[in-house]
Amino acid sequence: MRFDPPLEEGHLLRRYKRFFADIETPDGEALCIHCPNTGSMFNCMAEGGRVWFSRSNDPRRKLPGTWELSETPQGRLACVNTARANPLVEEALRAGSIAELTGFTGLRREVRYGLENSRVDFCLDYPDGTAFVEVKSVTLGFADSPVAAFPDARTERGAKHLRELAVLARQGVRTVQLYCVNLSGIAAVRPAAEIDPGYAQALREAVAAGVEVLAYGAELSPAAIRLVRRLEVCL
């Protein structure tokens, strides 16, 4: 996934009200841009740290740009725009880059299913059945550790998705929880039980029910992002 036009660089002044970030560009221009991340962004940003943003020329937009990448306090690069995860995964699926999910004959997005009226990110159609794939974007890293964690804030919605996948898995349907790790320098992923023990428990129960758990790491730069390697999942 290439950024077109290329991202612009700035320094973070502050993030506030979840959806807003004040930044300063190298030429001294102060901008308020959109922050497309509803999580805590814990360990994912630092005031004064480098950020990269996409600029919009759409006169209908109230804000001139969107925060895309951040240099973390640990010196890693993170894609903070969670809306990038699904297109990034779809690109990898269509390219055959996710070895466990190749050979499908059809791909459907945002399909409603389950008793709790959820929407799964992707349904992959195979000659012998369908695979339900739920995607989560991971950006929570820690100093001196190559292990990232999810979530960075409590997420009942995430636990609900796992419950729904578990129901299908018990019925013999192939279900996959796929962690899209948009953070450089990572070798493995784990549930952040210290932040959301309910989600961690839901993940363990989903695995026991037969839900597959995959994690793929991204190669990130201000020019492009792409999923390049499978990562270990530590349950």
UniProtKB/Swiss-Prot annotation:
One term of GO molecular function: DNA binding
One Pfam family in the UniProt entry: SfsA
Superkingdom of origin organism: Bacteria
Family to which the UniProt record says this protein belongs: Belongs to the SfsA family.
PANTHER family documented for this protein: SUGAR FERMENTATION STIMULATION PROTEIN A
UniProt protein name: Sugar fermentation stimulation protein homolog
